[in-house]
């Protein structure tokens, strides 16, 4: 079942001179299995929105349901995995194992069941078992992000909610997170990610929700977003589209910009080589 928001409004410092309207009359429906990107500038209301999904924040008006239930219910909280923008802010246990096990133990699962979930989540997040005894805060930024992700996955969530999961990571860390999310999406998990920059996520998203000043100004597919918002294709995407129009399929894996350029240059070199061979063959035929 979906997440449904109806006429949601959220205020900070309500009924004071400092009152701020963070969300205004938001209506949104997220279906099971979707990969949704929530896009907007800093302060637009993105992070406020996702805090509603598992009851971290209550709306001042309107109604939200997750699988038909109130998001503050224990059943919903156990099915919604959250990963925050700064992984260090949610990593507080002494070891990676304890960190990943925290959620299942907190929701009453046995130690045996919890151990199974820890190893399952570890693999899903592409982490090595040798890391289980390490201090989470001693890890690299990308590794900490994946530990936080594993902690969310240990709940076997129906919904995975991510707040700027690749912000601040180096290219290798970003690639690891994106490839992990692609794998998780293939298992049928609903993924909702907040971002101020679609770079990296764009090939994975099935729907984009654009928030401006607390209101949803657009929601639709990637194609609709680019047409409606007049988004120019970056050079790499333009080149890939040109190759596809010629019937040339480029490896659809999640690329870094450098990898995409290498792939495109490889294919273009192949085209030029075939063209040269064809011209030589035609010249020999004429002789």
From Swiss-Prot:
Keywords: ATP-binding, Cell membrane, Membrane, Nucleotide-binding, Translocase, Transport. The keyword Cytoplasm does not apply. It comes from the Archaea. It is found in: Cell membrane. The keyword Nucleotide-binding applies. It is a peripheral membrane protein. Transmembrane segments: none annotated. GO terms for cellular component: ATP-binding cassette (ABC) transporter complex. Signal peptide: none annotated. It is an enzyme of class 7 (translocase). SUPFAM superfamilies: P-loop containing nucleoside triphosphate hydrolases. InterPro entries: AAA+_ATPase (IPR003593), ABC_transporter-like_ATP-bd (IPR003439), ABC_transporter-like_CS (IPR017871), ABC_transpr_CbiO/EcfA_su (IPR015856), ECF_ABC_transporter_ATP-bd (IPR050095), P-loop_NTPase (IPR027417). One of its GO terms (molecular function) is ATPase-coupled transmembrane transporter activity. Probably part of an ABC transporter complex. Responsible for energy coupling to the transport system. Belongs to the ABC transporter superfamily. This is Putative ABC transporter ATP-binding protein MM_1038. It comes from Methanosarcina mazei (strain ATCC BAA-159 / DSM 3647 / Goe1 / Go1 / JCM 11833 / OCM 88).
């Amino acid at each position: 079942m979906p997440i449904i928001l109806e006429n949601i409004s959220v205020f900070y410092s309500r009924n004071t001179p400092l009152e701020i309207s963070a969300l205004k009359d938001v209506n949104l429906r997220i279906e099971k299995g979707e990969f949704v990107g929530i896009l907007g500038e800093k302060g637009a209301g993105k992070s406020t929105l996702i805090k509603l999904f598992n009851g971290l924040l209550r709306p001042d008006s309107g109604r939200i349901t997750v699988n038909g239930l109130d998001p503050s219910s224990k059943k919903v909280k156990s099915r919604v995995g959250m990963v925050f923008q700064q992984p260090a802010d949610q990593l507080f246990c002494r070891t990676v194992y304890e960190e990943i096990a925290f959620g299942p133990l907190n929701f009453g699962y046995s130690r045996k069941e919890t151990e199974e979930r820890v190893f399952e989540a570890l693999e899903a997040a592409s982490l090595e078992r040798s890391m289980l005894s390490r201090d989470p805060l001693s890890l690299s930024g990308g590794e900490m992000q994946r530990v936080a992700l594993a902690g969310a996955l240990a709940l076997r969530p129906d919904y995975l909610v991510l707040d700027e999961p690749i912000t601040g990571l180096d290219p290798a860390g970003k690639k690891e997170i994106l490839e992990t999310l692609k794998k998780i999406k293939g298992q049928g998990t609903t993924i909702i990610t907040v971002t101020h920059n679609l770079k990296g996520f764009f090939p994975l998203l099935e729907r984009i929700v654009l928030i401006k000043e607390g209101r949803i100004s657009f929601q639709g597919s990637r194609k609709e977003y680019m047409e409606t918002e007049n988004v120019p294709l970056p050079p790499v995407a333009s080149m890939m589209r040109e190759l596809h129009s010629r019937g040339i399929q480029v490896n659809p894996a999640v690329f870094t910009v450098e990898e995409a350029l290498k792939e495109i240059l490889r294919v273009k070199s192949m085209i030029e080589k075939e063209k040269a061979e064809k011209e030589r063959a035609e010249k020999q035929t004429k002789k």
